[in-house]
């Protein structure tokens, strides 16, 4: 794995490296510092050389690539004909709510949540029913469905807690959803980054799961391709496929042709890079968790993702940890308040070199 020097990372000029002053070390937004997958760089260079800048073609190669990757990694792959390219995961979630749930029905949102999950009910004109993501209590979910909720936003693996859900749990969850004719809208963007065991594809666990789940994923986190604008949505029953095909192109369009090439490439050729990334991230996770616990921070060590949820309650910075760490320690973590009002919490991104991680932890320790 190649780790770019700090100046190289700054020269990327991405959001992570431009939002805050240069003396602030960014360990916040879900963007990796790793060098790019070599096969991906080659594919992008080839596309630029061939001047592939026009309208994107049908994504048939991507469909097969995603299905093959899912089958190899998870033991279940969708029908390639049920896979469709979309600009990004959040667009897919919004479309799923608007076109595949009961009109006007409430949305179950487990908290803490990836901030766009909290915004989605607002922008789709729906009521939100909040539940505790630490518990993901099935009785609480069933009550919400019984009270009229039409869908659950199911981030599996979970962001920011890093929870990986079992087949048994998903089976029970989707059975409950089927009972109330509700939908499970599944965000699997972090699925490639499971540390122990195997990710369970929710749509593949049962017939009820196939009928209730709408699945959205992308290569954005595992291969750092967020700026290339190509996610994937796939369906696991014919009725949903038909409904999707009936949507206007205006509703679905916006995929980047370079994003299509990138996603197809890494699904087909990027597993060696992925495996190497996972080992580095696992080591970083264990190191960061041990060091932060020594400082009195409550650590939720993730089973997946390179994002670590931290609770600073009981420390001297509990009132505004992200703000204080940025101002006094010159290190930036995501503010827990944005994830549903968790004001004593923050989210740390450890997808970086050990040197960078050690420096970030040193800055945190200097404040605590």
Swiss-Prot record:
It catalyses: L,L-cystathionine + H2O = L-homocysteine + pyruvate + NH4(+); an S-substituted L-cysteine + H2O = a thiol + pyruvate + NH4(+). Keywords: Amino-acid biosynthesis, Lyase, Methionine biosynthesis, Pyridoxal phosphate. Transmembrane segments: none annotated. Pfam families: Aminotran_1_2 (PF00155). GO terms for molecular function: cysteine-S-conjugate beta-lyase activity; pyridoxal phosphate binding. The keyword Transmembrane does not apply. Disruption phenotype: Cells lacking this gene show methionine prototrophy, suggesting that additional methionine biosynthetic pathway can be present in C.glutamicum. The mutant strains also completely lose their ability to show resistance to the S-(beta-aminoethyl)-cysteine, which is a toxic lysine analog. InterPro entries: Aminotransferase_I/II_large, Class-II_PLP-Dep_Aminotrans, PyrdxlP-dep_Trfase, PyrdxlP-dep_Trfase_major, PyrdxlP-dep_Trfase_small. Pathway: Amino-acid biosynthesis; L-methionine biosynthesis via de novo pathway; L-homocysteine from L-cystathionine: step 1/1. Its EC number is 4.4.1.13. Its cofactor is pyridoxal 5'-phosphate. The modification N6-(pyridoxal phosphate)lysine is found at residue 221. Belongs to the class-II pyridoxal-phosphate-dependent aminotransferase family. MalY/PatB cystathionine beta-lyase subfamily. Catalyzes the transformation of cystathionine to homocysteine. This is Cystathionine beta-lyase. The gene is metC.
